Design a protein with these regions (language model features):
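Short linear sequence motif anchored by a di-proline
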Residues: 1-127
Length: 127
């Protein structure tokens, strides 16, 4: 994933898009929509709960390995590469069972110091 992304939709629209029941939306944990969401901030995610239902809730944007005693590590863990995540110690366990959908309106990639915003042609929700 990139280092910055945007979500300009309201959470009701996100819940509807991903078939999350109203009772399974934790509004109190969800951040305000933003066009500058950065690592270590609170983000919204859709994930399957232990009850087998989809839940929309807030989450810390990074990956904290189970063996870590702190959220703050000496190296960033928010940007796993799909081609190597299954073999890196920090990501291995999570790639097997901890999946989530991260809804976004778009994301930013930089060329030098200039950000470029990527989004769907008609601003449909990305995930």
């Amino acid at each position: 994933m990139c280092r910055r992304f945007a979500l300009g939709l309201d959470w009701d629209a996100v819940a509807s898009q991903f078939a999350v029941d109203e009772d399974d939306v934790r509004v109190d944990t969800l951040p305000q929509p933003s066009y500058n969401i950065a690592p270590t901030q609170n983000i919204g995610v859709v994930a399957q709960g232990k009850d087998g239902r989809r839940h929309l809730t807030g989450a810390y944007w990074s990956l904290v390995p189970r063996w870590s005693a702190s959220k703050v590590l000496s190296y960033p863990t928010y940007n796993a590469r799909v081609e190597s995540a299954h073999v890196k110690p920090a990501f291995t366990e999570s790639t097997k069972s901890m999946r989530a959908i991260i809804p976004a309106s778009g994301y930013y990639e930089w060329k030098g110091r200039r950000p470029f915003y990527f989004h769907a042609p008609h601003d449909e929700l990305l995930s």
